[in-house]
């Protein structure tokens, strides 16, 4: 079993953020949502929070809202009654729960393990998303809550005691690997090295360790880093969704391409399939561009490096490459279907011309007048 050397360490101040990302539709009219939220004065409803960090340029700026609710117990920890809601124009929503950290450091492993695919939080977060969709339904284009959810944990440690000679991120890698992986069973050296390999620091007193299940942040005022990680998690969800949609589009495109044509096709039947495939291709390309171009990091190379590390850990480049490849394949299918439809139309025109010529020749053999 896992034996912690964190026993002598105590967290003085910290927060665990449990983030759940959902997709609720094709797009969201943020201005309309903003007006609706501003006009809603009912207690316990959504309210605005601070704007995006200064180094961020969102296009357009997502809505960051707060919502009151009851606390949830996870082991010995209680969530804050205030839940953070982020709404993106490309159809994504995140629900973030906060757990105060102010006790033995070794409790982080238990909390990380308990939060991994935590059913009560998954159920509660989906319920909040369903309520949100009901509230802003008219502001959502093609509203539909996807089955997929992308959850992520961020442990932000501002201070701990007693002071250590070496920073924890260099002297306690084994223990931190257990926190990052949410695993109490002993880990192999290779697993420990992999879990803690994506590490970045700006100064001597801060560090960020980024893994696929969670991240551990050391230092004060790490909200910018947290915001980058939250967006990367949303981007991962959207890439997964888009990749799955393109798989379906490719299957439907291949089926339409290989479908045996009718002997006498109805007018416009080929155009219908071609238009449908073109719409799937355009939808995929637009969503890809909107997601990948939403966040711009202005004048802060450190945050840009944090994003690159998160992208590396989440394999976003591999998802991007897969999506671009499938978009190209879908375009190829569209071109083939379009060419086939054009050929079909030309063949029909040729037969019409042949029939007209035959009729004109046949008519010439029959006198049209009387005696």
Language-model features: where?
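Extended, charged amphipathic alpha-helical segments
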Residues: 170-269
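Short, surface-exposed, polar/charged, turn-prone segments marking secondary-structure boundaries
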Residues: 47-49, 122-126, 237-238, 244-248, ...
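Membrane-associated alpha-helical segments
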Residues: 241-361, 367-368
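Short secondary-structure boundary segments
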Residues: 34-58, 224-241, 357-367
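Short, flexible coil/linker segments at or flanking structured domains
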Residues: 73, 81-83, 198, 203-205, ...
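Short Lys/Arg-enriched alpha/beta "domain-start" segment
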Residues: 1-206
């Amino acid at each position: 079993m896992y034996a912690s050397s964190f026993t002598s360490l105590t967290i003085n101040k910290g927060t665990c953020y449990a983030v759940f990302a959902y997709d609720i539709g094709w797009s969201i009219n943020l201005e309309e949502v903003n007006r609706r939220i501003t006009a809603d004065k009912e207690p316990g409803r959504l309210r605005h929070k601070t704007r995006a960090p200064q180094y961020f340029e969102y296009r357009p700026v997502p809505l960051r809202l707060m919502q009151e609710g009851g606390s949830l117990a996870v082991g010995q920890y209680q969530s804050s009654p205030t839940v953070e809601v982020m709404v993106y124009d490309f159809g994504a929503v995140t629900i973030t729960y906060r757990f105060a950290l102010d006790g033995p450091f070794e409790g982080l492993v238990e909390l990380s393990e308990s939060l991994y695919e935590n059913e009560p939080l998954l159920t509660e977060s989906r319920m909040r998303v369903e309520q949100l969709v009901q509230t802003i339904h008219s502001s959502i284009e093609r509203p539909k809550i996807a089955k997929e959810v992308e959850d992520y944990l961020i442990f932000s440690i501002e201070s701990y005691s007693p002071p250590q000679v070496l920073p924890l991120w260099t002297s306690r890698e084994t223990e931190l690997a257990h926190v990052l992986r949410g695993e109490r069973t002993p880990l192999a050296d290779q697993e420990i090295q992999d879990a803690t390999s994506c590490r970045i620091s700006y100064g001597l007193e801060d560090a960020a360790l980024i893994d696929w299940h969670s991240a551990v942040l050391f230092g004060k005022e790490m909200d910018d880093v947290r915001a980058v990680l939250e967006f990367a998690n949303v981007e991962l969800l959207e890439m997964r969704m888009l990749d799955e949609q393109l798989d379906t589009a490719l299957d439907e495109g291949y089926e339409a391409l290989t479908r045996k044509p009718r002997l006498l096709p109805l007018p416009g039947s080929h155009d219908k399939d071609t238009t449908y495939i073109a719409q799937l291709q355009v939808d995929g390309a637009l969503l890809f561009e909107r997601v990948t171009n939403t966040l711009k990091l202005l004048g802060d190379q450190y945050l840009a490096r944090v994003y690159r590390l998160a992208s590396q850990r989440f394999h976003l480049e591999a998802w991007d490459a897969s999506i671009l490849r499938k978009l190209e394949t879908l375009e190829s299918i569209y071109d083939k279907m379009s060419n086939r439809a054009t050929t079909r139309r030309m063949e029909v025109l040729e037969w019409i011309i042949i029939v007209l010529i035959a009729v004109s020749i046949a008519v010439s053999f029959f006198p049209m007048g009387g005696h």
